[in-house]
């Protein structure tokens, strides 16, 4: 049975056990493996920037940081992680749900190395090794806010969602977004599609262009680099075609077309957890899944203060007056029981 910890505020250390691996005062090497590309202007970029911040802020504790990216199969992930181990890494971060299985294997085989993984998808019966910390995010909470804004912003009454690969995490974006939109306007029409890629800019552009041609005027995406294609489609069409980004504030890419972005600040989460590890004399207290959401400040909208009603919704979500769906089953219950549709 896995143990899930809910983090409140930045009091991160209080949530971990005192049963970690051995401490050390030596300078450490921190490595990171991401699925995809490092400079994706989104998810992976945030994680990479966090490593660079750590090196700058803890020069007396960190010998070096190293990041690498790969898009491949399970054996490729394991091989690259083995190379990072051989390079002398003390702490290795894995970024992306595709690395879920690899995280369990390498952490079990290398108990003296500390591991962290962002966005894994574990079954309820998975035992998390004591040298592994898993971090997951309540992205549906931020997507709910984005969906509410999209429904209010749309002039056509039609909005869209483009996800990358179908799965738990992308579905959380989708159903959070759709729930928020329906909460704002029960009659809003929503079309959702998947690009089946986190790296194909062209397919993102193609799907978005088709959506816009059908009268959709707001698209939220959670599709990695494929999302760049969505932005390009809106930018090329000009005024009246809007996008809502994911993971980082991407508004600088098309200021006239962006409404907001659903921030999933994995960089802050990675920085906080690693920083506590360093401050705690290199004791990595794992064996747990840590959930972070709106309450923790790592999920949200960068311009939430521009929308008065969003602050009200945030409070309702944090206080559990609104329980945001993260999958299709929960969404259907939400629609029937909460919205009476």
UniProtKB/Swiss-Prot annotation:
Protein name in the entry: Basic membrane protein B
Subunit and interaction comment: Monomer.
Lipid-conjugated positions (S-diacylglycerol cysteine): 15
Keywords of the record: Cell inner membrane, Cell membrane, Lipoprotein, Membrane, Palmitate, Signal, Transport
Top-level taxon of origin: Bacteria
Family according to the record: Belongs to the BMP lipoprotein family.
Alphabetized Gene3D superfamilies for the sequence: 3.40.50.2300
Result after altering residue 45 to A: In strain: 212
Chain's role: May be part of an ABC-type nucleoside uptake system involved in the purine salvage pathway.
Leader peptide range in chain numbering: 1-14
Species in which this protein is naturally found: Borreliella burgdorferi (strain ATCC 35210 / DSM 4680 / CIP 102532 / B31) (Borrelia burgdorferi)
Lipidation positions, renumbered (N-palmitoyl cysteine): 15
